[in-house]
Amino acid sequence: MNVQEQGFPLDLGASFTEDAPRPPVPGEEGELVSTDSRPVNHSFCSGKGTSIKSETSTATPRRSDLDLGYEPEGSASPTPPYLRWAESLHSLLDDQDGISLFRTFLKQEGCADLLDFWFACSGFRKLEPCDSNEEKRLKLARAIYRKYILDSNGIVSRQTKPATKSFIKDCVMKQQIDPAMFDQAQTEIQSTMEENTYPSFLKSDIYLEYTRTGSESPKVCSDQSSGSGTGKGMSGYLPTLNEDEEWKCDQDADEDDGRDSVPPSRLTQKLLLETAAPRAPSSRRYNEGRELRYGSWREPVNPYYVNSGYALAPATSANDSEQQSLSSDADTLSLTDSSVDGIPPYRIRKQHRREMQESVQVNGRVPLPHIPRTYRMPKEIRVEPQKFAEELIHRLEAVQRTREAEEKLEERLKRVRMEEEGEDGEMPSGPMASHKLPSVPAWHHFPPRYVDMGCSGLRDAHEENPESILDEHVQRVMRTPGCQSPGPGHRSPDSGHVAKTAVLGGTASGHGKHAPKLGLKLDSAGLHHHRHVHHHVHHNSARPKEQMEAEAARRVQSSFSWGPETHGHAKPRSYSESTGTNPSAGDLAFGGKASAPSKRNTKKAESGKNASAEVPSTTEDAEKNQKIMQWIIEGEKEISRHRKAGHGSSGMRKQQAHESSRPLSIERPGAVHPWVSAQLRNSVQPSHLFIQDPTMPPNPAPNPLTQLEEARRRLEEEEKRANKLPSKQRTKSQRKAGGGSAPPCDSIVVAYYFCGEPIPYRTLVRGRAVTLGQFKELLTKKGSYRYYFKKVSDEFDCGVVFEEVREDEAILPVFEEKIIGKVEKVD
């Protein structure tokens, strides 16, 4: 029997509707029986001379390896060949259809070289090693090595071990051609396919589609022709066109009955546009709404939309535009009669709508083609470089100007702040180095004498007329009340200036019997000066009044000198005695009363009289000088009375040190006159900022009766406190003076070690005697414990023991002013 392997006719009348395999009809073993009446024009276009296999799996297979070229009747295997492909890789590679389908899958995955290399190695091993084939074998070995092994980027080279590649390279270079030289590489590639590509092929869509349709579904033809038969390539889905490659088709164009010839081998934009209409419906009928993937890493793209690397329409309009135009309702309506002939029937419109939906599902979103980076405009360059540079320079200059303005403003604010804080009035090194003058606004809250001293500056005592200095100063202060105090480099005030300040400041005379003693009605300057003057008046009481006034003013000036050149001047005895002491609260109270004359001066200035700037007349000077002398004499009498009471300067200094840390004793009722006490309470706050300056003159002495009463009260308190403390604890507290860890007198420290813990617990318990019951209340964990407490004992050499205490009423022993115990759990 002559059996041809090509061009078997289709017997459409003998088709079966069942999917189960059937044996062939007797006498028709050589015929191909189709199980499906669908036309064969649904197949794919072949890539390299691949034909269409139209026979079914139920037809009698033609086996060239059998004696008759086919299997006899009754011996056909009931298992379809595509099911045997899933048994092993060799079963797949033994069948031509399986090889074709497997190669198609590998092409989609980009690893078809694995299968080609495997077949190349098999073919090289089958070459007989003879002299005639030696040259052919050498060329073939070199070709295999260069194409698959030498290229390090190829998939075969990547899947081959380096030792195997080195062995093949040595064989090729030394021309030691052996039939088994590629066996190791073939084994490695076969293992790779069995582990990766072969399982993926069995799960792929192309294999599942092939098995579902019983090998009758159209399939993409491979490079190698099937041994079962050949056919013509029909139009269908074109393969994916890569941007950097030119699509080629080596298949010869054969004409079919009733069919146009296949497209030419070269794919062009014009050809795609011409064949768009027939490709759209054919693709819909084949896929039935299913998507066919050409590669697992790439979205499906219909070649119709790939136009030389650029899209002709957006993705929304490119999705099956032919179907949209067919289903559009843009036809004109004929309203001549009752019929509407322009609208297609509802069934057709519904069918078109369903076709569009299926096409959208198949195509999906059409991705835009890749645009090379060189065609893209850089994002940074949006304007011309020259304009950009000008704008940048302009903005940078604006930023620089803003920063400079901010720096200047900060410098000005800093300068103003330093002026307000009295930076120019910083003291030189020495006793005045740690003190600063107050800021400018603070001068208005002080008595007139301090205001004059701060604003007039440090001037020479023998350089200018005191009256002119005073006039200039008053005018300047009234004109600019917030002026800056002069620095230390200026001149010190002279005696005339100080005397004039005292005269102008004390506008109210001291009337009444309390005024000469307490100085409440005198000006602030007199209050602060009399302690320097009265020590020298009683020695030379026969001197004239003018001389005493000049001497008093000179001594006051020497005590008020703030510059470094005045520290060598002679200081009065009382000043030297009181420089190391802080002024008492009573002194602050006496000095604070000086705000009354300043208020009167301010009222005069506001009313326009400007009395402080007027030079007093001769009669006024004489009257005020007389008042000053009267005040000096009264002060001398007061001091002599203090000395008779046996209160020396050392006691005063000690008492003042105590007074600085206690409440104001002058505020107590009964210490002074009730009205005076009220006035003093109102005038004490706020105190001067520089009242503790050691170079400032001391305030007048407080009432000695008040100081004696305060001293007696403190002594009584100390005696009461000493009687409460035991002698031993008082000695210990004196030894630990200054430490804040000493417990109060009515509490005791309790420390205990709980169940062998290395760190003790410490707490404070009220009372000196602590019982075991009180100690148990301190424990946070309740249970059965034994209690031991440390005490002094001579029984052992160590000198101490831990004594167990069991009774709750027992007093716990004390060790070094603490109760130290150990709590052990009873087993």
Curated annotation (Swiss-Prot):
The modification Phosphoserine is found at S75, S77, S217, S468, S485, S492, S509, S578. Pfam families: AXIN1_TNKS_BD (PF16646), Axin_b-cat_bind (PF08833), DIX (PF00778), RGS (PF00615). Residues 353-411 are annotated as: Interaction with SIAH1. It comes from the Eukaryota. InterPro entries: Axin-like, Axin_b-cat-bd, Axin_TNKS-bd, DIX, DIX_dom_sf, RGS, RGS_sf, RGS_subdom1/3. Residues 433-501 are annotated as: Interaction with CTNNB1. Residues 530-542 have a biased composition (Basic residues). One of its GO terms (molecular function) is protein kinase binding. Residues 348-432 are annotated as: Interaction with GSK3B. Highly expressed in testis, thymus and lung. Less expression in cerebrum, cerebellum, heart, kidney, skeletal muscle, spleen and liver. Residues 88-211 form the RGS domain. Component of the beta-catenin destruction complex required for regulating CTNNB1 levels through phosphorylation and ubiquitination, and modulating Wnt-signaling. Controls dorsoventral patterning via two opposing effects; down-regulates beta-catenin to inhibit the Wnt signaling pathway and ventralize embryos, but also dorsalizes embryos by activating a Wnt-independent JNK signaling pathway. Also facilitates the phosphorylation of APC by GSK3B. Facilitates the phosphorylation of TP53 by HIPK2 upon ultraviolet irradiation. Homodimer. Interacts with ZBED3; the interaction is direct, enhanced by protein kinase GSK3B and casein kinase CSNK1E activities and decreases GSK3B-induced beta-catenin serine and threonine phosphorylations. Component of the AXIN1-HIPK2-TP53 complex. Interacts directly in the complex with TP53 and HIPK2. Interacts with DAXX; the interaction stimulates the interaction of DAXX with TP53, stimulates 'Ser-46' phosphorylation of TP53 and induces cell death on UV irradiation. Also binds ANKRD6, PIAS1, PIAS2, PIAS4, MAP3K1, MAP3K4, SUMO1, SMAD6, SMAD7 and RNF111. This is Axin-1.
